[in-house]
Amino acid sequence: IISFDPNLRPALWNHLDEAKEKIAFGMSQCDVLKISDNEITFMTGETDIDRGVQKLIEKYQIPFVCATMGNQGSKAFFGSEIVEAEAFLMEDTIDTTGAGDTFCACLLDYILRYGIQKQDKERVREMLQFANAAAALITTKKRSASDAGTRRN
């Protein structure tokens, strides 16, 4: 299984066209894509998440896509299914660094445990809720990657 998270940081690129080209290559190689709402807009010009993801799936033939939308939650697209999960909004958020990476780690944990082909809507909803909760928890403390926590947390 090849996963890809574009993790677009415009300030790190001399030319955004080059970023788009490199991200497109990553998408063309992956089985699992974790992508944020702003990255969907960057790559497709679409502000509608569903339409943007459908464009990416059609163009790159990606079997499993998870879109993160900040306080709007997340969505998974697989086969002909779309599953949504609400965000966990934390009153004591102090640093969002690592939230996307934490979400992606939880996503991959579920896929490795249950397989990419054997996903059903309920399991995917559970996966999104788990990933959203973990991503929310990571924002409540200033921490390093080594302090990310465990499945139990």
Roles of regions detected by a PLM:
Residues 45-153:
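Conserved phosphate-binding/catalytic region of the ribokinase-like
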Residues 1-55, 62-63, 73:
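Conserved beta-alpha-beta core of the PfkB/ribokinase-like small-molecule kinase fold
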